[in-house]
Amino acid sequence: MKIISVNAGSSSLKFKLFDMPKEELIFSGLIEKIGDQKSIFSLSYGNTKKETIMPVLNHQQAVKLLLDSLQINKIIDNLEEIKGVGHRIVQGGELFKDSVVLTEENILKIESLNDLAPLHNYANVLGIKAFEKNIPNIFQVGVFDTTFHQTIKQENFSYAIPYEWYQKYKIRKYGFHGISYKYVSNRTSEILANKDSKIIVCHAGNGVSLCAIEGNNSVDTSMGFTPLEGVPMGTRSGNIDPTIIEFISYKENKSIKEIMNILNKKSGFLGVSGVSNDARDIEISLQNGNKRSLLAHDVQIKRICDYIGSYYFLLKGIDALVFTAGMGENSSLFRKKIIQRLSFLGVFLDDEFNNSKGERIISTSNSFFKVLVIPTNEEIEIVREVCKIKN
């Protein structure tokens, strides 16, 4: 059974085609700069990789290009072979506790949450409607980044603000990276052979968050009402004193919108280092003696350890600490600096395993809890959800 996973952005469409239930990746690609005369269409299947520059004016045209390419490259004979499409949707609010079939009613509910994620949800719906137009009556499922965190208790998701703000506007912690956390949590349970395991997962890419998980349920997470809350990231500030916004507005004569743009897109690694938002560039720079790059790195490491300590206390001890996503999977320095700060908990790295690749345990056998690296796979988790609902 062939299922497509889709991640639609405002000017991009990322997709992967899987043969299920074998979970075999058949075809993948990315369409960038949608709405431009020089859109970039990249695709990959088998040993073949292609890139084409061409005008792609909207998401409907992007989906048609994807579907046509599947037939042109003889990946499928006809569109009837595609049995379902799973869409990553960023914000499900309190309306969605699990993945859902994308009926007209559910699409309207997703659109009603646009205030909570104006850029993301709008783009996600463009992707949904584009598939509807190209393959009428195709079975589509929405898989939300927020639903994994719907198990968080009210004392953990509430802000100490006027309660009417929550009642009127649903201002609360929602958390993100939930699709990744679900995949990694399930995989960790398999490795530990313990469905009730208590783990802390550090999802560290350009966006960074942590999650305390018990029995495959989210207990708390570092991102909040938006992905800006939590630890410093590639371009996001993470937690700051809110009065800084008013202070900078007065000092630099900037609007709130301008300052929020700086906190989202010009802070984090980029803001502190002045070098880059990319962790790889930061590591090269700090190893070459750049003090601001070292500061940017150390500030992030310190804040991550703050959350690990908090969640360790919340869970009353853990079975494992898990690293995933870009930095989490690929940076041995990142992991080493964190574990060094946690050594008082009785956890130590095996340097050989820390410096190797792939899914593995990287802690020593005498460590008080295990440290794992598990490459995330959000696309697989999305198509699994499609199959679960379809069946």
UniProtKB/Swiss-Prot annotation:
Q: Name one GO biological process term.
A: acetate metabolic process
Q: Where is this site: Transition state stabilizer?
A: 177, 236
Q: One MF term from GO for this chain?
A: magnesium ion binding
Q: Which cofactor does it need?
A: Mg(2+); Mn(2+)
EC main group: transferase
- Reading the lineage from the top rank, the first entry is Bacteria
| Binding site residues for substrate | 88
Which InterPro entries did the record assign? Ac/propionate_kinase, Aliphatic_acid_kin_short-chain, Aliphatic_acid_kinase_CS, ATPase_NBD
Question: Which residues are annotated as active site?
Answer: 145 (proton donor/acceptor)
Annotated cofactor note: Mg(2+). Can also accept Mn(2+).
Q: Which reaction does it catalyse?
A: acetate + ATP = acetyl phosphate + ADP
Where is the protein localized?
Answer: Cytoplasm
Q: Which UniProt keywords apply?
A: ATP-binding, Cytoplasm, Kinase, Magnesium, Metal-binding, Nucleotide-binding, Transferase
Cite the binding residues for Mg(2+): 7, 378
Its pathway is:
Metabolic intermediate biosynthesis; acetyl-CoA biosynthesis; acetyl-CoA from acetate: step 1/2
What are its GO cellular component terms? cytoplasm
Q: Where does ATP bind?
A: 14, 203-207, 278-280, 326-330
Main localization is cytoplasm
What's this protein's function? Catalyzes the formation of acetyl phosphate from acetate and ATP. Can also catalyze the reverse reaction.
The protein's assembly and partners? Homodimer.
Similarity comment text for this entry:
Belongs to the acetokinase family.
Designated name of the protein: Acetate kinase
User: What's the name of its gene?
Assistant: ackA
